[in-house]
């Protein structure tokens, strides 16, 4: 995955047309070390326009290493799904998904260029990645926490506040702007009920556990209380 990220953002055309977003961006760029497994590279189309040239360039960049992907296109997104084998023993099948948001061509706080480096036995590379501020990445995570039932979103927000020291006031302000763009205004009480209901669902709790290394200690109840107290209580301010 790290090689694919370097390959994409080393390409002059792609780095001007795409911005890195999502959980993988948080763990690769803002957290001290990646804390959970991820097989998704989430990117945003920066400039409105045809997606074809971008897809062609991504495949010319990645296919020589990863092979031919399956392509899926929906309203607002395009996904390239690759299946490969791990480079080191034991060899295991891996999946890498590159998902492009073709709907949101903006950054509330402006796009950021962050250095990224990979050093391994199999690949060395450096690039500057076009991405979002920490708080904007977490604001879109907050939106995901409301809109879907995946405990990894709560985990990422917890890390963002505790380790990366993100500003919860900025997160909420940016979250509100994203929701306003969608035409989907949500109040704090409704969000608290939404998250409280999810905390009772086994699938929400178990979602992140399979993604964590054995040495990572995570308390979802503590995370729930933290996000509620630091973020959700500010939505109505």
Model-inferred region functions:
Residues 1-18, 29-41, 45-237:
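Structured mid-to-C-terminal alpha-helical surface segments
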């Amino acid at each position: 995955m790290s090689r694919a990220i370097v390959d994409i953002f080393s390409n002059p055309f792609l780095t001007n047309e795409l911005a890195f977003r999502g959980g993988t961006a948080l763990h690769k760029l803002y957290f001290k070390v990646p804390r959970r497994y991820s097989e998704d590279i989430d990117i945003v189309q920066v400039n409105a326009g045809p997606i074809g040239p971008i897809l062609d360039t991504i495949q010319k960049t990645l296919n020589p290493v990863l092979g031919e992907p399956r392509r899926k296109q929906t309203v607002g997104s395009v996904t390239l799904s690759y299946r490969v084998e791990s480079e080191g023993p034991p060899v295991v099948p891996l999946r890498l998904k590159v998902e492009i948001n073709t709907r949101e061509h903006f950054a509330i706080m402006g796009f950021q260029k962050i250095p990224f480096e990979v050093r391994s036995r199999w690949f060395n590379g450096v690039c500057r990645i076009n991405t979002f501020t920490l708080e904007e990445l977490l604001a879109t995570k907050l939106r995901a926490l409301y809109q879907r039932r995946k405990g990894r979103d709560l985990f990422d927000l917890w890390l963002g506040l505790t380790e990366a020291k993100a500003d919860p006031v900025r997160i909420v302000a940016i979250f509100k702007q994203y929701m306003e763009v969608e035409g989907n205004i949500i109040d704090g009480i409704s969000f608290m009920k939404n998250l409280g209901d999810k905390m009772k669902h086994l699938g929400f709790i178990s979602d992140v556990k399979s993604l964590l290394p054995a040495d990572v200690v995570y308390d979802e109840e503590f995370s729930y209380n933290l996000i509620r107290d630091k973020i959700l209580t500010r939505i109505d301010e």
